[in-house]
Amino acid sequence: MKPSIVAKLEALHERHEEVQALLGDAQTIADQERFRALSREYAQLSDVSRCFTDWQQVQEDIETAQMMLDDPEMREMAQDELRKAKEKSEQLEQQLQVLLLPKDPDDERNAFLEVRAGTGGDEAALFAGDLFRMYSRYAEARRWRVEIMSASEGEHGGYKEIIAKISGDGVYGRLKFESGGHRVQRVPATESQGRIHTSACTVAVMPELPDAELPDINPADLRIDTFRSSGAGGQHVNTTDSAIRITHLPTGIVVECQDERSQHKNKAKALSVLGARIHAAEMAKRQQAEASTRRNLLGSGDRSDRNRTYNFPQGRVTDHRINLTLYRLDEVMEGKLDMLIEPIIQEHQADQLAALSEQE
């Protein structure tokens, strides 16, 4: 491993020990905000520190085994020990490289998930409902909280569009690669000839930003309409104009929210989604401007980004970005998404490592 990388790891290991000491300090414990910030930093440094400690131990093992090579009686055992230690050292170096990759500051944040029915009419709306259920089951398994912000139901079930806020540890980092086009191939219930139809939905995943980081929105750039909410809600529904539609005139972005009974709460929710959408649009523009020849696995949430195809007759799901095909569609639709999410994260990390080695 390069001396510059070892020096960086030593500094991070020292900082980990320093933060550990600070967390035990009475003054730190009294300051809740500082305590939370240091706890987050400690958690982030723990994996690097542990991995680096293991690597240092393996270097000592290599040194010991090399010294034993001079002893004829110990040589065979020493050669075996040396081979194992070198293999372990290589594995740890790879892990450390991944742990040192620049972190996306948004990865630990909550996220807004939008699922929209695209081409395919009723069948697309039904599939949007299936996708939302799939993500909800995944969230449930990870103990995340799902809160529906706004939903427009399809005429025969499912959703024309649904927006939800998903809260928990590392939500955006796990779900961000879901943004893009999702295609379904199956026989609709209304199809008497047994023909397979193809429909599509788009998914967009955006980090929830703290108020301080939300883009400045000029109130003069907003058109706010109120209307009567429709859907569940008992007697209160259709009695007051509590639903909100906000249009951001410069970008044409429209957000509706009718989930709460209070107009004030709906407006606050709609503004937070609007801020996240404007931020996402700005990020996409920046990524396009910086786009090199390297592929970008992070979809824009645009229909043209073809992420996956879900083929029901064959029980097959294919991720087109990394040429991954699994015949485990039933499990995927029940929310077992890690088998699709992990490979794309690993591919993204491999791309980052390749970019770093090119810079060097």
Swiss-Prot record:
Region described as Disordered: spans on this chain: 285-313
Pfam families, per the entry: PCRF, RF-1
InterPro entries found in the cross-reference section: PCRF, Pep_chain_release_fac_I, Pep_chain_release_fac_I_sf, Prokaryotic/Mito_RF, RF-1
Post-translational modification: Methylated by PrmC. Methylation increases the termination efficiency of RF1.
Keyword Protein biosynthesis tagged: yes
NCBIfam families the record matches: prfA (TIGR00019), PRK00591.1 (NF001859)
Protein name in the entry: Peptide chain release factor 1
